[in-house]
Amino acid sequence: MTARRISSLVALLVATGFASPVSAQHGMDHSMHRMGPEIVIPKGALYTKADVEFMQMMIAHHAQAIVMAKLAESNSTNAQLLKLSRKIDQSQMPEIQIMQDWLRRYNQFAPDTASWHDVRMEGMLTDQELAEMNKARGVQFDRLFLVGMIKHHAGAIKMVDDLFKSPGAGQEVDTNVFANDVVAAQTAEIGIMKRLLAQLPKQ
C-alpha cells in the first residue's frame, strides 16, 4: 500500500466526515464489545446492555458501508451498481441518526461516524481491503465492491442474529423494529448484489 493510496483514501474520509483526527478522544477501546464509557443500565430499564452495544457497533458498521458506497461514485461506471450504492448511502446515514438518537434518549454514549475506523465488527473490511477498493476502477472495482458489500451486509445480519440470541435483548420496541428492518433491507440488497456480481464479465 503506497503513501499516495493511503493519503487519497484518508482525504476522501476526512472530506466526507468519516475520519477525524480527534476520534480517539471518544474513548474507543478498539474491541468488538464496547466503545466509550462503561455501559450502565438503570434498574427497570426496557433495554439491555446488548441493545446498547448493538446500536453503538452498528453505527460504526453503517459508517463503513457509507464510505464504501461513496467510493463507487468515482470508481465505477456501472449504472445498476451506482443506483444501489446511492441507495445504501442515502438510507444508512438516516439510520445512523436513528441509532444515535436512541442512545442519547437513554443517556448512553453515541459514537460519531468516524468510529468505524476504531472497531472491526462482523463483515467489516480491513484497511488493506479498502485501499485496494480505492485503487481499483471499472469492473475490477465493481467486483471488489460487490464481494465486499455482500460480506459487509451479511455481517450486519449476523449482528442482529447475535442481538436476538442475547437474553432479554431486542425486545425494546424501537430496537426490535430497527433490527428487523436492517435484516429485511440488507437481505434484499444482498440478493441484488449477487445478481449484479453474476452479470460482471468473467475474469
Where are these regions (language model features)?
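Bacterial N-terminal signal peptides
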Residues: L9-G17
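N-terminal signal peptide c-region/cleavage motif recognized by signal peptidases
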Residues: A19-P21
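Bacterial N-terminal signal peptides that target proteins for export
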Residues: M1-V10
